[in-house]
Amino acid sequence: MTPAIYLVKGRDKSLRRKHPWVFSRGISKVEGTPKLGETVDVYSFEGKWLAKAAYSPHSQITARVWSFEQEPIDRDFFIKRIEQAQLLRNDIIERDGLTGYRLIAAESDGLPGITIDKYQDYLVCQLLSAGAEYQKQTLVEALLHCFPECHIYERSDVAVRKKEGLDERVGVLHGELPPKSVVIEENGVKISVDIVGGHKTGFYLDQRDSRFQSMKYVKEKEVLNCFSYTGGFGLYALKGGAKRVINADVSQPALDTAKFNAELNGFDISKKRAVFLNADVFKLLREYRDQGTRFDVVVMDPPKFAESKAQLDGACRGYKDINMLAMQILNPGGTLLTYSCSGLMDQVLFQKIIADAALDAGRDVKFVERFEQAADHPTDTAYPEGFYLKGFACKVL
């Protein structure tokens, strides 16, 4: 008999709207002794069947819904979800000429806690939930059915797994260990990805659309690319005809890859055109401000400042300070391209932070364009939490 959980009276409303999470405070009782990650049936307080979900007793999100249909959660289920996700992305892949893209965007693709990025013939899995870990072998079998020629590598080296009672894991799940450099292409730009040692699963695929849209602002401009990582925005700036691009990052290996990427695309990397600067961005911006160094375009794409609600106030201060500094080093009429990947910070709050930064910088600033995550990172209508990346193009007068 399948284990089951019963909800507190009245706590079934979100599930009836197809939201995929059940919180611990919403559960009245558990029937049976489900294992960590095992599939359970979810019932309302009155005993009406609602969903099949993965059980995670250590997490505040105690159950994550696999399906709102009475169906087995087996190999065929995962094959169906993967095929649906691939079909959703086929037009995007053709349009943007992609050899690297997000195949599975967790809850938004009906596979909670599972993120899968495809880089050429390498599928890179990040399994964030107990249910994802429990179904790992079944998931691998389904992936091999859909992509029989692919190697599969796990990058579940993320702290959030501890909340699920899981250890961090990395390693080969099928095939060969990825090489140090796997070259992908997007919008005609070649990018070297370090799957094993890079950030996230190797690269920030979610910023692809923003990178492409940034090109309209950079022609014949002096561009400062902050938190450049392996140079994504810098590559598009060079492609878009920027006069000069300074890529600033605290990681020398990332800067080395950024330089390699520029060479890979045949761009001029003389110091007159491209600079790769190892620096703390906060300190660098203050130095530029105090020295009177100015730019036409500043790209501000920092790492996530808020991992929890307790960190949100500090994150707000950090975002405000860094955007204020960016505004202070822009020439009149310059463009600030600024982004936040903190899911806890919604677009309204981020917009207010930019407004506060403008006041502190003493600059008149206009929002002229809004950005969000790339199209292969969809957001399900029932899961607004899937919308996490937001950005603005601002004219600084």
From Swiss-Prot:
Xref: SUPFAM superfamilies: PUA domain-like (SSF88697), S-adenosyl-L-methionine-dependent methyltransferases (SSF53335)
EC number in record: 2.1.1.191
GO MF term (any one): rRNA (cytosine) methyltransferase activity
Keyword S-adenosyl-L-methionine carried by entry: yes
Subcellular localization: Cytoplasm
Catalyzed reaction equations: cytidine(1962) in 23S rRNA + S-adenosyl-L-methionine = 5-methylcytidine(1962) in 23S rRNA + S-adenosyl-L-homocysteine + H(+)
Keywords: Cytoplasm, Methyltransferase, RNA-binding, rRNA processing, S-adenosyl-L-methionine, Transferase
GO cellular component: cytoplasm
Task performed by this protein: Specifically methylates the cytosine at position 1962 (m5C1962) of 23S rRNA.
Family of the protein in this entry: Belongs to the methyltransferase superfamily. RlmI family.
Main subcellular location of this protein, as a coarse class: cytoplasm
Keyword check for rRNA processing: yes
Listed name of the protein: Ribosomal RNA large subunit methyltransferase I
PANTHER family in UniProt: RIBOSOMAL RNA LARGE SUBUNIT METHYLTRANSFERASE, S-ADENOSYLMETHIONINE-DEPENDENT METHYLTRANSFERASE DOMAIN-CONTAINING PROTEIN
Ranges where the PUA domain occurs: 2-78
